[in-house]
Every structure is written in C-alpha cells, then in structure tokens.
Amino acid sequence: MGYYALFYDVVDDFVERRAPFRTEHLKLADEANRRGELVLAGALAEPADGALIIFRGDDPNVASSFAKNDPYVQNGLVKNWEVRPWTVVVGGEARAGVSDTGGDA
C-alpha cells in the first residue's frame, strides 16, 4: 500500500459555484474515507485556488477514480487534476528511526 496525493486546480469562482455539487462531493469523499482510501482532504486557502486530497491504496487508481467520479470535476469546477505518489517519511506508517541523510525529504 502507498499514499497518493490528488491535486485540484479549481476555477476562479469555485467557492461561489460549488454549492449545488457540494453534498454529492462530500458524500463521495465520506464513502472513500469509510473504505479506508481517503485519508485527508481539504481546500487550499488564501487564495482558494485548489485542493489536496490524500489517498491510501495499492495504486494511483484509488485517487484517479475518485477524481473522475467527483461532481466538482464532472461539472467543470476543477480545471485540472493530477495524481502523484507521496512518499511518507515521518508520521503515519513511516519507517521508524528517520535520520537526516541528505536525501529526499
């Protein structure tokens, strides 16, 4: 199992336009959380120009499937989205005894 970060780049008037789709978006997120796939999620602030959603799964499809089914994506509130593997170094299920080796963060 690994972690995957889903990044959303949203439209300029996202906050004003999201209301009709928010309940379904949150339902989708809650279901993914209950299945143990969605770990953390939230909008970026100041400015509200994106969102970050962290998933845990066997492959990046856990995150891309969410995005493809998200009402925010389907209704044009998300301009672009990207899934990237996330290497957890500290916290959660990270290996114990992390030291500064000068490598990746």
PLM regions: where:
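Conserved, structured core segments of small domains
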Residues: 1-105
